[in-house]
């Protein structure tokens, strides 16, 4: 009987540990909504001020690695114009969560590929070009409950605006827009809600 005690103790400990892991693991699918600050620099953003906006995404988390896909939207004032510019489009974001020995707080690193368009308020101006945006950075997840995480993050990005045409509907005039590059810094504050069991 004495020889069985170490084995039985090990089994009990392993069962408790496994149960703890299940309690700590997030649901594999989650929805996230965030508010954004988008600071813009370079020729691709000439005339645009820093902007604010929002994003929504769905994320699949099978392990420490996860993949998200969603839609982002920011609004930017234009120098010497009454219109605002809207930068919007879809993105894919892989992420890797770093184990830091805590069940409450977890840092992560991330990358993001976005394909974006530019729109203008008022309906007079239109731009045929698209943005390609590549961002990298990281953040911190704070566990608020078994289903809800607070997400605070920031990324730095490379942006390329393709060739296109800027058209005024009221005058019928158009101006060619040459391909150009720029950079951006995005700060994000959001909530992620786990779905299912």
Predicted region positions:
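Cleavable N-terminal export/targeting peptides
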Residues: 1-28, 196-197
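Short glycine/proline- and aromatic-enriched beta-strand/turn motifs that initiate or cap beta-hairpins
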Residues: 23-67, 73-76, 182-197
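Outer-membrane beta-barrel channels and translocator barrels
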Residues: 26, 61-65, 99-105, 143-147, ...
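Residues that define the transmembrane beta-barrel architecture of outer-membrane proteins
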Residues: 29, 48-54, 84-90, 105, ...
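Structural signature of outer-membrane beta-barrel domains
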Residues: 38-42, 74-78, 114-118, 157-163, ...
């Amino acid at each position: 009987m004495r020889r069985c005690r170490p084995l039985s103790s090990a089994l009990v400990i392993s069962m408790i540990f496994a149960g703890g892991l299940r309690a700590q693991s997030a649901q594999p699918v989650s929805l996230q909504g965030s508010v954004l600050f988008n600071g813009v620099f370079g020729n691709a953003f000439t005339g645009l001020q820093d902007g604010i906006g929002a994003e929504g995404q769905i994320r699949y988390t099978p392990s420490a690695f996860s993949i998200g896909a969603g839609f982002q939207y920011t609004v930017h004032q234009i120098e010497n114009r009454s219109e605002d510019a809207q930068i919007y489009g879809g993105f894919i974001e892989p992420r890797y969560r770093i184990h830091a020995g805590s069940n409450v707080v977890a840092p992560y690193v991330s990358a993001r590929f976005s394909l974006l368009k530019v729109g203008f308020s008022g309906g007079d101006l239109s731009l045929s070009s698209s943005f390609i945006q590549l961002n990298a950075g990281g953040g911190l997840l704070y566990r608020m409950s078994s289903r809800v995480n607070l997400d605070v993050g920031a990324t730095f990005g490379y942006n390329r605006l393709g060739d296109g045409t800027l058209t005024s509907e009221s005058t019928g005039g158009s101006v060619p827009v040459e391909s150009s590059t720029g950079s951006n810094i995005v700060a994000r504050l959001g909530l992620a809600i786990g779905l299912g069991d």
